Amino acid sequence: MEFLLSKLFGKERTVSVYITDAVEMQMLNLEYRGKNNSTDVLSWSYYEEDHSALHVGDLAVSWDDVCKQADTNGWDAKTEMIRMLVHGCCHLSGLDHERSKDEETEMLALEEQLLTHLGLPGLYDQFPLP
């Protein structure tokens, strides 16, 4: 996490990570996004409002979704968890792949770069960038 936070935010920062199951994640997703389904990761950024904040935000990760996606993608749950933490931290930095195609491309390219630095190159080779 230190590597991710230093690359994305430039200095020592903190983030909270809450690991839960699909049932609770569905409730959180409904409460905070109005979507009545589980999701892999949710993020709450404090950095977007205050760039001087030491605590940049909170992440919730569904272990059930991590395991399901790992199986679908053909890698282990540890690799998928790292991918979700990278993805969530990119959201904390202010990026959102749902806002526009350009931002989706930017976010996925950044995720690929970070994952490569973490020793996981080529994870998105099977998912071409938009």
Predicted regions located by residue number:
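An acidic/histidine-cluster motif and surrounding catalytic segment
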Residues: M1-I82, C89-P130
